[in-house]
From Swiss-Prot:
One Pfam short name: Colicin_V
A GO BP entry: toxin biosynthetic process
Full protein name: Colicin V production protein homolog
Compartment annotation: Cell membrane
Any Gene Ontology CC annotation: plasma membrane
Gene that encodes it: cvpA
Family: To E.coli CvpA.
Membrane-crossing residue ranges in chain numbering: 7-26, 31-53, 66-88, 101-123, 136-153
Its membrane topology: Multi-pass membrane protein
UniProt keywords, alphabetically: Cell membrane, Membrane, Transmembrane, Transmembrane helix
InterPro entries per UniProt: Colicin-V_CvpA, CvpA-like
Length: 161
């Protein structure tokens, strides 16, 4: 094992520990809320900039609308997370939630490493590094990346009408 493998293991362990303490339902709801928030933001951000009538500069007006939306979004997310915590405590599924959260964290850590590795290979000469070539985990990550890219290419590029 070399440096890349050690970093990979550390990232996966940190992700698993964080997800263990947060729990599966909170992790899942967090991802769902972030996706919905980003979609709503890109669809309606111009609507929020209308409320900034005191600012004449369009760029500054958009920045203010981004900040206002982000603050409201974080407020809504914290309320939703609190409701999920209460639900978990009332149902008594805390241990199962934490165990599934740990597995979710492992998967999230592997996906994060695959994304980072993909962009390192795409944008840099990192693939020619001796640590990269001698890594134990990199071939497995690359295999997963190739499967995902092949699937996405077939699904969204070749059959797009």
């Amino acid at each position: 094992m070399n440096v890349i493998d050690c970093i990979s293991i550390i990232v996966i362990i940190i992700s698993a520990v964080i997800s263990f303490f947060r729990g599966f339902l909170q992790e899942l709801s967090s991802i769902f809320i972030w996706i919905v928030g980003v979609c709503v933001f890109f669809r309606y951000y111009s609507f929020f900039s209308i409320f900034s009538t005191y600012v004449r500069n369009i760029f500054l007006k958009n920045i203010i609308s981004y900040i206002v939306f982000f603050v409201f979004f974080l407020f809504f997310k914290s309320i939703f997370d609190y409701c999920i915590i209460i639900f978990i405590e009332k149902c008594g599924i805390s241990l199962i939630n934490k165990i599934f959260g740990m597995f979710f964290g492992i998967i999230r850590g592997v996906l994060f490493l695959c994304i980072v590795l993909f962009f390192l290979e795409l944008l840099t000469n990192f693939a020619y590094n001796k640590y990269f070539k001698n890594s134990f985990f990199v071939p497995y990550f690359n295999c997963f990346i190739k499967v995902v890219i092949k699937y996405l290419f077939k699904k969204y590029i070749l059959f797009k009408s």
